[in-house]
Amino acid sequence: MKKSFTLIELLIVCTIFSFFSVGIFSFFISQVHLQTQTLMLQQAFSELSFALDKMSREIRMAKKDDIEYKKVTKNCSGDLEGTDKLNFWPIPDGISFRDYENRCHKFFLQNNQIFEEAQPDIPALPLTSTSTLIIQNLRFNLTGESQNDGKQPKVTILIDAKIKGKYEMPLKVQTTISQADIDFEY
């Protein structure tokens, strides 16, 4: 008599093999989705990191407005009342200050992007793109911005963003920068 498999044994083996195949296929599909999500998150953090580094570097090197620096007196605040000899002053959805190259520098939110402008040399240029990241809110909290408050100037940057696309995830980033120059009265 020949030994062989019965129909029930073959069906059981095929069913077990099907379950393993579906499980392995599902695992690989989930890993592809996870990798896509991770790459989008890395791109978003890369953009936010670049924008924060750029803003931090410029804000750290800010100079007081309306004082002589490099033999030039610059008035970046315009005719705003109470802005004499300030380090920073708020603008709608942003911050403005005099930078170390005697330019009037601004960082602001426009069309869900962070923009930088340094007059007269640099027109408004985006620091973030809208292809992977949507900036929902950009806030600058100022401390010690006036000359006579006895505090070292500090700026806290708060960014609310979300990753654009299939895997929308909210991101909140905060950092605080103090001015490099010691704050004393002129």
Q: Residue locations for each model-derived region?
A:
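Aliphatic-rich helix starts adjacent to a transmembrane/signal segment
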Residues: 2-56, 60
